Swiss-Prot record:
This is Glucose-6-phosphate isomerase. The modification Phosphoserine is found at S86, S107, S185, S455. It comes from the Eukaryota. It comes from Rattus norvegicus (Rat). Pathway: Carbohydrate degradation; glycolysis; D-glyceraldehyde 3-phosphate and glycerone phosphate from D-glucose: step 2/4. The modification N6-acetyllysine is found at K12, K142, K454.
C-alpha cells in the first residue's frame, strides 16, 4: 500500500484543511444549519436499548465528512474488515488470524480459518464455562473443607486483567448472588499481599490467566497464591479445588498442580487486549452470571453486525475512526480523552488506553517502512464529574486541542433522591460539551462581569481570563442504560474504531513487539540485583540506579 501521505484522498483533505480549517467555527456551523444535530448524529436501536452518537460538535462539515469516507474507501477499509471477519491472517508479523469476533458470534454462522470452522471449538469452551459457573454460583463446587466459593481471584496482567476488571466493575449491579471478585496483576508484592489479607483459603478460587503459562508477573503471583493457600490446606491435592487455568499450555498447567479438566482453552487468534470475550472472561461470568456474560457477547455481536453491514458514512466505529484521523493527521492532536459520566465505567478509559495504544502505537507500516505521519493517540480519561474539578481546565482554556468522547447512560442504576443525583450528572454532561463547543465570547464575558458589579478597572483586568475560545471538538455517546448488552456494544464499537484507524495508517494493530524489549532487559538485570558488587555492564545511568538500589535496600528507616 502506498504511503498515506501520498494518497490522493489524503492530499485532497490536506489541501482543504490548509485552505479552510480556520473558517470551521462550531458556533457558526450550528447557526447556519438548525438541523446540524440531525445531519451529524446516529441513533442506533439495538432492540436492547438505544445508543446515540452525536458527532455534530466536531470540526467537520458534509464536505469534510465525504472526503474522510473517501479516504477510508481508498485505504481498503471495507476489504480489510471483510478479511478479518473471514478468518484471513491479517496479523502479518505473527502470521495469525484475528478472530475475537468469532468469540461473540451469536448468530453461530461458520467462520473458517485454514479450512476449518472455529465455531464448534468456541461453543465447546462457552458450554464448559457455563457449566462451571453454574456449579460455583450454586454452591455445588466445594473447597477442600466443603465450603462454597465466596471469592474469585483473577491473577493475570494486561489483556488477562484489564478487560475482566473493567467489565466486572461496570456490571456490578448485575452481580447479585455471585461471588466477590478480586484482580491481581502487578508484580509489586503489595498487590497480592493486600488482596490475600482479605481472603479465606477455604472459600477462595484462583483463576490463573496466562496463554503461555509462562508470563513472569502472573506465574510469580500464582506461585505466591499457591504457597499462601497450602500454608492452610497442607495437602497439594487440594489445589485442584481452588485453582483453575485460562491457558493453552496443558503441560505447564499440570506442572503447577491444576487439573487439566479445569483448564479453559483459548487460541492464538485471540489477542490479549481482545480476549475478554473468551475464557479470559471467566471471572466476569462467575461474578455476574453466565446469562449476563452471554448478553455482553450479544451486544458486541450486534455492533459487529452494524460494523459489517452499514455503509461507512452511517457506521459508528468508522465515523469515530475518521474523526480521530482528522484530528491526529490534520490538526496535529496527540491525545484523546474518554470521559464516562458513570462511576461504574471508571476503568473504561484505562481499558482502551491498552486497547488503542498497544494496537496503534506503532511507527512501522505493514511493509516495514517508517511512517512519515502520526499514528495512535495517547488515550486517557477519568469519570465525570471528577475530571471537571481536575483537568478540564486545560481542555477548556489550554493551548492544546484535546478531542473528547463524553459517554453517559440516560437511566441510572441508582435513582436515589428521586433521581436528583443523575439529573445533576446529566446536566453537567450536557453543559460541558456545549461549553467546549460555544465557549464564551469577550462580549458575553463583559456583560457577565458588568452584571456582577465589577468596576471598569476590575472588568478589564479579569476579562481575558473569562473568555473561552470554544471550538473544542467532542463526541457525545448517550445510551439508554449501562446493561451487559449495551456495554458489549460500546466495547466492540471502540475495538472496530481502533481497527479502522490501523488500516488507514497501514500498521498492524494486532501485534505488540514494543512490550518485549523491556521484558528481555529485565531478565538480564534481575540476577545483577543480587549481592553487593558494582554493576558496570550498562550505561552509566542504569549502572548508577542499580548501585543506589543496592546501597539503600538494607537501610533501616523508621
Amino acid at each position: 500500500m502506498a504511503a498515506l501521505t501520498r494518497n490522493p484522498e489524503f492530499q485532497k483533505l490536506l489541501e482543504w484543511h490548509r485552505a479552510n480549517s480556520a473558517n470551521l467555527k462550531l458556533r457558526e456551523l450550528f447557526e447556519a444549519d438548525p438541523e446540524r444535530f440531525n445531519h451529524f448524529s446516529l441513533n442506533l436501536n439495538t432492540n436492547h436499548g438505544h445508543i446515540l452518537l452525536d458527532y455534530s460538535k466536531n470540526l467537520v462539515n458534509k464536505e469534510v465528512l465525504h472526503m474522510l469516507v473517501d479516504l477510508a474507501k481508498s485505504r481498503g477499509v471495507e476489504a480489510a474488515r471483510d478479511n478479518m471477519f473471514s478468518g484471513l491472517k491479517i496479523n502479518s508479523t505473527e502470521d495469525r488470524a484475528v478472530l475475537h469476533v468469532a468469540l461473540r458470534n451469536r448468530s453461530n454462522r461458520s467462520i473458517m480459518m485454514d479450512g476449518k470452522d472455529v465455531m464448534p471449538e468456541v461453543n465447546k469452551v462457552l458450554d464448559k464455562m457455563k457449566s462451571f459457573c453454574q456449579r460455583v454460583r450454586s454452591g455445588d463446587w466445594k473447597g477442600y473443607t466443603g465450603k462454597a466459593i465466596t471469592d474469585i481471584i483473577n491473577i493475570g496482567i494486561g489483556g488477562s486483567d484489564l478487560g475482566p476488571l473493567m467489565v466486572t466493575e461496570a456490571l456490578k449491579p448485575y452481580s447479585k448472588g455471585g461471588p466477590r471478585v478480586w484482580f491481581v496483576s502487578n508484580i509489586d508484592g503489595t498487590h497480592i499481599a493486600k488482596t490475600l489479607a482479605n481472603l479465606n483459603p477455604e472459600s477462595s478460587l484462583f483463576i490463573i490467566a496466562s496463554k503461555t503459562f509462562t508470563t513472569q508477573e502472573t506465574i510469580t503471583n500464582a506461585e505466591t497464591a499457591k504457597e499462601w493457600f497450602l500454608q492452610a490446606a497442607k495437602d497439594p491435592s487440594a489445589v485442584a479445588k481452588h485453582f483453575v487455568a485460562l491457558s493453552t499450555n496443558t503441560d505447564k498447567v499440570k506442572e503447577f498442580g491444576i487439573d487439566p479438566k479445569n483448564m479453559f482453552e483459548f487460541w492464538d487468534w485471540v489477542g490479549g487486549r481482545y480476549s475478554l470475550w473468551s475464557a479470559i472472561g471467566l471471572s466476569i461470568a462467575l461474578h455476574v452470571g453466565f446469562d449476563h456474560f452471554e448478553q455482553l457477547l450479544s451486544g458486541a455481536h450486534w455492533m459487529d453486525q452494524h460494523f459489517m453491514k452499514t455503509p461507512l458514512d452511517k457506521n459508528a466505529p468508522v465515523l469515530l475512526a475518521l474523526l480521530g484521523i482528522w484530528y491526529i493527521n490534520f490538526y496535529g492532536c496527540e491525545t484523546h480523552a474518554m470521559l464516562p459520566y458513570d462511576q461504574y465505567m471508571h476503568r473504561f478509559a484505562a481499558y482502551f488506553q491498552q486497547g488503542d495504544m498497544e494496537s496503534n502505537g506503532k511507527y512501522i507500516t505493514k511493509s516495514g517502512a517508517r511512517v512519515d505521519y502520526q499514528t495512535g493517540p495517547i488515550v486517557w480519561g477519568e469519570p465525570g464529574t471528577n475530571g471537571q474539578h481536575a483537568f478540564y481546565q486545560l481542555i477548556h482554556q489550554g493551548t492544546k486541542m484535546i478531542p473528547c468522547d463524553f459517554l453517559i447512560p440516560v437511566q441510572t442504576q441508582h435513582p436515589i433522591r428521586n433521581g436528583l443525583h443523575h439529573k445533576i450528572l446529566l446536566a453537567n454532561f450536557l453543559a460541558q460539551t456545549e461549553a467546549l463547543m460555544k465557549g464564551k465570547s469577550p462580549e458575553e464575558a463583559r456583560k457577565e462581569l458588568q452584571a456582577a458589579g465589577k468596576s471598569p478597572e476590575e472588568l478589564e483586568k479579569l476579562l481575558p481570563h473569562k473568555v473561552f475560545e470554544g471550538n473544542r471538538p467532542t463526541n457525545s455517546i448517550v445510551f439508554t442504560k449501562l446493561t451487559p448488552f449495551i456495554l458489549g456494544a460500546l466495547i466492540a464499537m471502540y475495538e472496530h474504531k481502533i481497527f479502522v484507524q490501523g488500516i488507514i495508517w497501514d500498521i498492524n494493530s494486532f501485534d505488540q513487539w514494543g512490550v518485549e524489549l523491556g521484558k528481555q532487559l529485565a531478565k538480564k538485570i534481575e540476577p545483577e540485583l543480587d549481592g553487593s558488587s558494582a554493576v558496570t555492564s550498562h550505561d552509566s545511568s542504569t549502572n548508577g540506579l542499580i548501585g543506589f538500589i543496592k546501597l539503600q535496600r538494607d537501610t533501616k528507616i523508621d
